[in-house]
Amino acid sequence: MTEYTPMIKQYLEIKDKYQDAFLFFRLGDFYEMFFEDALNASQILEITLTGREGGTKEKIPMCGVPYHSASGYIDTLIEKGYKVAICEQVEDPKTTKGMVKREVVQLISPGTVMDERGLKAKENNYIASLYCYEAKEYGFAYSDLSTGELKSTVIEASEDRLINELTTLSTRELIVSSSEKEVLSDVMKEQLGLTFSVHEEDTIPVENEKLVTRHMSLSEKRAIGKLLHYLKETQKRDLGHLQQAVHYETSNYMKMDYYSKRNLELAESIRGKGRQGTLLWLLDNTQTAMGGRMLKQWIDRPLIDRKKIIDRQNDVSELMAHFFERLELVENLKNVYDLERLAGRVAYGNVNARDLIQLRNSLYQIPRIRATLLSMSSESLTELANQLDPCEELTEKLEEAIMDSAPISIREGGIIKDGYNSQLDTYRDASRNGKTWIAELERKERELTGIKTMKVGFNRVFGYYIEVTRANTHLLPEGRYERKQTLTNAERYITPELKEKEKLILDAEEKSMELEYQLFSEVREMVKDYIERLQKLAKSVSEIDCLQSFADISEKNHFIRPTLSEDGSLHVKQGRHPVVEKVMGAQSYVANDCDLDENREILLITGPNMSGKSTYMRQVALTAICAQVGCFVPAEEAILPIFDQIFTRIGAADDLIAGQSTFMVEMLEARNAIVHATKDSLILFDEIGRGTATYDGMALAQAIIEYIHENVHAKTLFSTHYHELTDLEKELSGLQNIHVSAVEENGKVVFLHKIKEGPADKSYGIHVAELAELPKSLIERASRILEQLENDDKKIIIASVKQPEEVHEEVQLSMFPVEPEKKASSKETKLLKEIASMNIMQMTPMDAMNKLYELQSKIH
């Protein structure tokens, strides 16, 4: 058995309790890692791997980072989904005999980050917990530790529902029991980008019982208990900033699954996965970090309560009507600090003097914001204004105590104002007078010795000294000057008078800094008493910030106030896609109408690729979402229903569905929509059926349309390349054909991007291929095939189309060798017709590969 050194034994004992984390083991001025942690961390952090004697024949792998710069390394590990256990020396090595005692003082994980550098200002950092009750329902709770937010609900015991909730929140970490983790699918565990943490205890800690209300269900309480226990065990400190748990119902908000939100690019771009080009990016003119976070919450959960929507609309109208007051409001909001996260850091004991200065400056703005809102006539804005708590006593205390120029460090003085504490003033006077005396001493000594270059200096090692260049040392009188330090070109001395004064000055400075830190700590503790009030203030300021952002964006982009229909009808005149219009410019964007009602429930959209079908469909959904978050909408006129759900199937397979084909994903999403949609829902289906054989796809598309028409009655926009489906208008009374128009000019196609009634007369697919700059010979061949197919009622065999005489090189697109004179078999005819009808430009690489496999299987 290996006999490790005492220090390595101590390390291994602590590491055994934190197997799923990197253990940052404090040794002097470094955090060291050993064994496997060292091997892994050296690669991830790109730091040097060394070795240390530890009682074994070979050196133990070791790497380390300086403690004063450790936060950057910790952030890197957390960002990659790892956990870090911070193990500190809890005894003073100078006064301890033998091994210094060490303990883990905090476990930092992706869901428990508190350092500002590891957080994004306008994004929440959520950690969630799950409790499965008899496989019937999930108790679900989540918190943003940095703000103190704590919420809970009960959801159906369905992995889809759980994924929707986790992705809506952009959850970083999920706490589950070991048995719960076992039943979650590998796809969910591997593809969501979550850190899973196993924790079994799920009763409410005694000190946190006040955070839970009686009416909550058992599963909900257990989920909250699991979350609170985990936070208590990992953070190892008071979590007094956690707010009372708020129960919410997912049914109180418009429902959209993860795929719909991604397809509509509400808060995350499909292309770069950032905010650029999303609805959130467009609507965000918030001036505060907490306002930005609330705006994302609003967009993630649009309202379905008519009164709440109208209240927000009224506030936006009022703010738009008071331009100059709104400008003043914006200027005041710019000076408001992140009060939510400040309250969290106060609870953690992590605030410095500059944080308190920013808090004070923020509180200065509150009476001004309140006065501006009260000058308007909106009842809800007046109510918001009256909720603004200026915390006057706290403001006065901070004004009285903290210097404007206070440093970041809280242990080196310069924080507390003169006049705040008489004892501190006494120490400061002694220090300042002593320094004045030293300056006078330098002048006198120069006169006495005649050495004009003589100077009095100070450093932390030797204290005060008189420095004389070596060339002038012979001018010093004997007896008074005691040599203290020898330099290359100078000598440093001390005199009895300087030695005496040095003690007085240094004692005063030391006592001053000790007292100043004590006074600062008292002020910081006082701020703790205001945490709850600051959190409530932050919510009110955030709401005001979101509303002014809506007003500003609506005015700048010429949005109008929508009317909410009572009968479920939708009528939009000259609607625009808000994000596309912003990117393209208002002059370039082509606006379109949209009308849906009980007699016109389904719009079947045809038209060429690149003509704007998908953009049109998305703009209808985004218009509805803008309305239901309380913002104005991009249109000339708009009458909109309140949608309970939006379902979309737009674009290729999503990367969340690992191992599924595009067609399988298509069918799963179609099923999700037609099973869960109601007459109050909106469905957007783009090219359903394209991932399988032509006739299969057409049959499925028709069946889906008929099912929605006969059973669901949801408002539906259905785009298709199957022009045969346009005949459904004759059979289905609630279906209307529309198309995106295009014209040919000089043999070239021009997309007008204008929606018109009726079906498209042709698809212009070859023109799109030409725009994509496919080889000219290929385009010519496709044109001839198309012409022959149209002339022969689509019964032509590809290989039988003769090449014109002027074409000298044979261009053979068929995958199958066919003799020129030989007539194709019926099997070959079907295959060739299928190839001819393929819409190549609409296919993803995966679609094309699937199609090739399918065709190949039909040959053999």
Curated annotation (Swiss-Prot):
It comes from the Bacteria. The keyword Iron-sulfur does not apply. Coiled coil: none annotated. SUPFAM superfamilies: DNA repair protein MutS, domain I (SSF55271), DNA repair protein MutS, domain II (SSF53150), DNA repair protein MutS, domain III (SSF48334), P-loop containing nucleoside triphosphate hydrolases (SSF52540). ATP binds at G607, P608, N609, M610, S611, G612, K613, S614. One of its GO terms (molecular function) is mismatched DNA binding. InterPro entries: DNA_mismatch_repair_MutS, DNA_mismatch_repair_MutS-lik_N, DNA_mismatch_repair_MutS/MSH, DNA_mismatch_repair_MutS_C, DNA_mismatch_repair_MutS_clamp, DNA_mismatch_repair_MutS_core, DNA_mismatch_repair_MutS_N, DNA_mismatch_repair_MutS_sf. Pfam families: MutS_I (PF01624), MutS_II (PF05188), MutS_III (PF05192), MutS_IV (PF05190), MutS_V (PF00488). The keyword Acyltransferase does not apply. GO terms for biological process: mismatch repair. Keywords: ATP-binding, DNA damage, DNA repair, DNA-binding, Nucleotide-binding. GO terms for cellular component: cytosol. This protein is involved in the repair of mismatches in DNA. It is possible that it carries out the mismatch recognition step. This protein has a weak ATPase activity. HAMAP family: MutS. Belongs to the DNA mismatch repair MutS family. This is DNA mismatch repair protein MutS. It comes from Listeria monocytogenes serotype 4b (strain F2365).
